[in-house]
Amino acid sequence: MATKADKKNAIRQDIIDSAGIYSQNLAGKAFLYVYGEEFFEVSFPVDHFLHLTGVETKLSAKEFYKNAKKAKLTNSQFYFDARHPYANARKKLPCLKRLPELTNDMVCILKDMQTVTIIYKLSVTNLEFTLGLTENTDANGNKINDFFLPMSLRVEDTSVEKSKNGEIIDFIFSKDASIAKYDTLLVEDKNKMIPDSIKHLISEKLYSTEHD
C-alpha cells in the first residue's frame, strides 16, 4: 500500500509534469473563443497555475510555478489542508495535465456557473472537467484588460447543471501574447463563418482564405 510519502511524491511529480505542459502550451499565449457573434479572450498567467493544482503552499504563486517548472519543487514546499484536501488534488492533477484540450478541442462555454463561493461569469468545459474563468482585475476590483484568467479547475460533472446556459464553441484562435493579432486557428466548426465582430482581432490571412 502506498505510504503518505509515496502519495505526496506522486502529487509532486504530477505538479511538475503539469507545470511543464502549462509552460509549453498555455503560458505566454492568448486564446480567442468565438461562439455565434460573441467572443472572449483568455490568457494563462504563471501565477494562476497554483490555483488549479488543488494544493496549498507558503511560496508565492510565481515561485511555486517556477520551482515546479524547473522540477525543483520539494514535498516540504506544498501541503494539504481542509480547504485543499489530498483527494481533491489527486482528482484535479490528471485534468490539469490535459488542460490544453480546452484550447484545442471542441468545447462548451458555460455562463454564470455557480459554486459554493463564487459565480463564474464564463467557464469552458469538455464535460469531463471545467475551467472557471475570472475577469482580470486589480486589488480594488477595477478591470485591467478584457482578458479572462483561469481561476478554478473543477472535475465534478455538475458544472453544466450549475450554469444558466451553455453554448458550443464555433472557433478557437491562439497567438503569442507578445503579438497583436491572432494568427493560429485551433478549432473551427466548418459550417460556420468567422463573424465580422472578431475580424479586427485576427490576422487577415485567417479570413481572407475563408470559404465563401
Residue ranges and their predicted role:
Residues 1-118, 123-125, 173-212:
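An acidic, glycine-rich, mixed-charge low-complexity segment common to nucleic-acid enzymes
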Residues 130-189:
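Compact beta-sheet-dominated globular domain cores
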